[in-house]
């Protein structure tokens, strides 16, 4: 059987590595500061590689050139490996997503998270959106606005197969874990489903 891949992508400092660790019950390497990790963290279970990609987007203290290089690397990685990627998990910070997205839209730009969501939907067969840091927001209001900004008509509950409210730091990831596992089982990737303990 050919190797398949599940990728985790998201802006710097959204809790991507923390979510990765919460789902798979082990610690992954993290940069000393957000945005400093340039290499993907990967591990393989059976025929599936699980990859935590570097965080993208502007990071205070780094040049825009550096941020663009990281984003370009992430996009190139996804395009290069698109044939083997069976699912992608985009992690957003639910507590700051709306503010950041609205700021970028006021400047006439497509927010990076929205651009990435659209890109992942174009190149990967299944996208899971992990709305992290839910302990810091009003669930319903924020999730409805997040869904709408990503092109999904509220209420967000209609999109439970896409949007997963999580709090990775507290280990509150059960719905995402369950559905990722079920999705892999539906693809006959039983060996990889063992990754979710």
UniProtKB/Swiss-Prot annotation:
A Pfam match is MMR_HSR1
BP GO terms, sorted: cell division
Q: Which residue numbers delimit the EngB-type G domain? A: 2-186
| Function description | Necessary for normal cell division and for the maintenance of normal septation.
What this protein needs as a cofactor is: Mg(2+)
> What is the protein's given name?
Probable GTP-binding protein EngB
PROSITE patterns documented for this protein: G_ENGB (PS51706)
The cross-references to Gene3D superfamilies, in alphabetical order and at most eight, read:
P-loop containing nucleotide triphosphate hydrolases (3.40.50.300)
Q: In terms of domain of life, where is this protein from?
A: Archaea
* Lineage of origin: Archaea, Methanobacteriati, Methanobacteriota, Archaeoglobi, Archaeoglobales
A Gene Ontology molecular function term for this protein is: GTP binding
Q: Per the database entry, which stretches of residues form a coiled coil?
A: none
Locate the residues binding Mg(2+).
Answer: 17, 37
Q: Which SUPFAM superfamilies match?
A: P-loop containing nucleoside triphosphate hydrolases
């Amino acid at each position: 059987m050919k190797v398949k891949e599940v990728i985790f992508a998201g802006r710097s400092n959204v809790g991507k590595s923390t979510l990765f660790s919460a789902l798979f019950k082990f610690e992954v390497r993290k940069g000393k500061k957000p945005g400093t990790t340039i290499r993907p963290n990967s591990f393989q279970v059976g025929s599936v590689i699980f990859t935590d990609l570097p965080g993208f987007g502007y990071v205070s203290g780094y040049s825009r050139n550096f941020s663009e290089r990281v984003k370009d690397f992430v996009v190139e990685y996804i395009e290069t490996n698109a044939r083997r990627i069976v699912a992608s998990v985009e992690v957003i910070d639910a507590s700051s997503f709306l503010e950041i997205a609205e700021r970028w839209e006021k400047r006439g730009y497509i927010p990076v998270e929205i651009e990435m969501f659209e890109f992942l939907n174009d190149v990967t067969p299944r996208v899971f959106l992990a709305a992290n840091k839910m302990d810091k927001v009003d669930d319903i209001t924020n999730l409805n606005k997040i869904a709408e900004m990503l092109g999904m008509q509220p209420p967000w509950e209609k999109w439970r197969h896409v949007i997963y409210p999580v709090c990775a730091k507290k280990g509150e990831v059960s719905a995402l874990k369950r559905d990722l596992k079920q999705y892999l089982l539906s693809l006959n990737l039983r060996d990889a489903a063992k990754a979710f303990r």
